[in-house]
């Protein structure tokens, strides 16, 4: 339910932003008949909107291009990025990541697995602990699964997981499988660096409209990461 609520809230935000822009354009169109400054302001706003849409389109293509699983590249470890936990059970988003991780691990029985994510509000256990319990209950040997329970966001997921792997002799130049939602892979892989090997978790078909919402939201997150980081 949290996944659906977040998607609906973001859609509402986009709706109000679009309504505000259309209102301003309407006012400028009205005043442009008698006031030259309004004509120039309207042209400037339209130019900015066109540039913004073009930038968004490029980012969206970039995000979509990473939503795939690379089965061919050999890796030295697997990192599963956390998502919400409902009490002690994985949320829909986290469940899809765990399913993708389990499927990827089937043919790679010797790889270490880092599960990363702290305990958030409304969660009875950490995201890492939830993933550990889920994977080990489905046959993954406990000694293969390394918990990282401090990370609160994607940047920390990457930083703390790299530190754990470094302690195991897996360095910056090593190839590591990054398991996360398809829409999230572009940003996560960009933060990880050249060694990132994508493993995409996909939503069930009935959640396709919500998935579109999340792909749109991720393009804005990528823009923020590029501009402010």
Question: What spans do the regions from the language model cover?
Answer:
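A transmembrane-helix-recognition feature enriched in membrane-embedded lipid enzymes
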Residues: 211-229
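Internal/C-terminal transmembrane anchor helices
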Residues: 39-61
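Membrane-embedded alpha-helical segments of integral membrane proteins
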Residues: 1-31
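A structural signal for short, hydrophobic/glycine-enriched beta-strand patches
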Residues: 58-216
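Generic intrinsically disordered, low-complexity segments enriched for polar/acidic and small residues
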Residues: 2, 7-13, 53, 101, ...
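Juxtamembrane loop-transmembrane helix junctions in multi-pass integral membrane proteins
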Residues: 3-6, 33-43
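Acidic, low-complexity intrinsically disordered regions
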Residues: 12, 33-36, 58
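Structural signature of transmembrane alpha-helix termini at the membrane-water interface
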Residues: 24-31, 54-65, 223-227
């Amino acid at each position: 339910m949290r996944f659906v609520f977040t998607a609906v809230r973001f859609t509402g935000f986009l709706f109000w932003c679009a309504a505000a822009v259309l209102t301003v354009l309407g006012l400028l169109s009205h005043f442009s008949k008698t006031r030259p400054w309004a004509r120039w302001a309207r042209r400037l706003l339209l130019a900015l909107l066109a540039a913004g849409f073009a930038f968004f389109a490029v980012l969206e293509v970039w995000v979509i291009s990473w939503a795939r699983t690379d089965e061919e590249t050999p890796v030295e470890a697997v990192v599963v990025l956390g998502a919400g936990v409902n009490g002690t059970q994985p949320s829909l988003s986290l469940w899809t990541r765990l399913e993708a991780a389990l499927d990827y691990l089937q043919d790679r029985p010797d790889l270490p697995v880092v599960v990363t994510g702290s305990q958030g509000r409304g969660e009875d256990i950490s995201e890492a602990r939830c993933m550990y319990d889920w994977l080990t209950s489905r046959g993954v040997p406990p000694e293969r699964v390394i918990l990282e329970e401090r990370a609160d966001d994607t940047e920390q997921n990457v930083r703390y997981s790299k530190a754990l792997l470094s302690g195991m002799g897996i360095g910056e130049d090593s190839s590591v499988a990054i398991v996360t939602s398809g829409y999230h892979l572009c940003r996560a892989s960009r933060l990880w660096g050249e060694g990132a090997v994508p493993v995409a978790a996909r939503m069930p078909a009935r959640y396709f409209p919500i998935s579109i919402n999340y792909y749109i939201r991720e393009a804005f997150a990528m823009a923020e990461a590029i501009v402010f980081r």
